[in-house]
From Swiss-Prot:
Keywords: ATP-binding, Cell shape, Cell wall biogenesis/degradation, Cytoplasm, Ligase, Magnesium, Manganese, Metal-binding, Nucleotide-binding, Peptidoglycan synthesis. Gene3D superfamilies: 3.40.50.20, ATP-grasp fold, A domain, ATP-grasp fold, B domain. It comes from Bacillus velezensis (strain DSM 23117 / BGSC 10A6 / LMG 26770 / FZB42). Residues 133-338 form the ATP-grasp domain. GO terms for biological process: cell wall organization; peptidoglycan biosynthetic process; regulation of cell shape. This is D-alanine--D-alanine ligase.
Length: 354
């Protein structure tokens, strides 16, 4: 399931392209569900061979529209005309609001369909940077200083917002929409003029934003895989050649060095992996997250954020980290499918009467 009515629609398409190429069509029957940028749902024909380009995944022309009022019947048809097998697992490859924020996960929960990745709570907490940071603070995880603002506050008292940032965080700082990923709408600010423009830009994408102090150090990432007993991958380092790791560097020109494995000490790896699992549990994660850290110039490890649906594009860090740990791309996908089935089976044992 991919696409979506989101600023990260194209990111989702790139992720879906990579995943469909890696899936073993002899082992899996792949049914594409495409959500257009207008929010329309299209079901495509069974994929019998790897998809070669993104246009083949955009199903406006060769897909079949269906209404959400008939989800059980139309969205998940029989696996084939000759058998009554239900869909085994849904793999949501949706990024951003309405995709990795718990909404699609809630829909799949209502349908009682197994799905890959985090549940409603973890997805929504992982999408909202403000809530995420509150949970990290409660879990005792060290992180950069931050402040949150609503669009209402900005419109009513802009000077007060700017003064609060300057007093509590200083420059440089980063302004981000609270509920968006892939570095969309993010700005680095070195002065008040840039800060004011950054507020305006971020509020174009969300009604709530977060401002974080700038941290001098390295950007370190690690993959987490599992349910109640998660494990960690190798660590990687992001070294953007631009001022910071923005959307263009992530998905377009690849103008970023990904160093895998990152050069860290055994003690630092142990601390990063321990904090990553602690962050995973703080949001009640399942399936997968990519945990992002800062390693400051004085050696301190700070949690930045977790991504509950990290990209699977050719430039993406998550699958590369697991490849370094000895898990290839196809095997990684199969493990995620098994984790989804495991978590779903566990939920079926829960009592709903008393």
């Amino acid at each position: 399931m991919y696409g979506g009515k989101s600023a990260e629609h194209n990111v989702s398409l790139q992720t879906a392209l990579a995943v469909t190429k890696a899936l073993n069509t002899e082992k899996f029957d792949i049914h594409p569900i495409y959500i257009t940028e207008k929010g329309e749902w299209q079901r495509g024909p069974l994929l019998t061979e790897p998809v070669s380009n993104v246009k083949m995944l955009q199903l406006e022309q060769n897909g079949e529209s269906f209404a959400l009022s008939a989800l059980n019947r139309e969205m998940f048809p029989e696996a084939s005309p000759d058998e009554k097998a239900p869909i085994d697992v849904v793999f949501p490859l949706l990024h951003g609001p309405n995709g990795e924020d718990g909404t699609i996960q809630g829909l799949l929960e209502l349908l009682n369909v197994p799905y890959v990745g985090n549940g409603v709570l973890a997805s929504s907490a992982g999408m909202d940077k403000v809530i995420m940071k509150h949970l990290f603070a409660q879990a005792g995880l060290p992180q950069a200083k931050y402040a949150a603002f609503l669009k209402k506050d900005w419109k009513q008292t802009p000077d007060s917002c700017l003064q609060q940032v300057e007093k509590e965080l200083g420059y440089p700082c980063f302004v981000k929409p609270a509920n968006l990923g892939s570095s969309v709408g993010i700005s680095k600010c070195r002065n008040r003029e840039e800060l004011e423009k950054a507020f305006e830009l971020a509020f174009e994408y969300d009604r709530k934003i977060v401002v974080e102090e700038g941290i001098a150090g390295r950007e370190i990432e690690i993959g987490v895989l599992g349910n109640d007993e998660p494990k960690c991958s190798a660590v990687g380092e992001i070294a953007p050649k631009t001022d910071f790791y923005d959307y263009k560097a992530k998905y377009e020109d690849g103008d970023t060095d990904l160093m895998i494995p990152a050069q860290v000490t055994d003690e630092q790896y142990a601390e990063i992996s321990e904090m990553a699992i602690k962050a995973f549990k703080a949001i009640d994660g399942s399936g997968l997250v990519r945990a992002d850290f800062f390693l400051t110039n004085d050696g301190q490890v700070l949690i930045n954020e977790v991504n509950t649906m990290p990209g699977f594009t050719p430039f993406s860090m998550f699958p590369l980290l697991w490849k370094e740990a000895g898990v290839d791309y196809s095997d990684l996908i199969e493990q995620l499918v098994e984790l989804a089935k495991e978590r779903h089976a566990e939920k079926q044992l829960i009592k709903h009467t008393f």
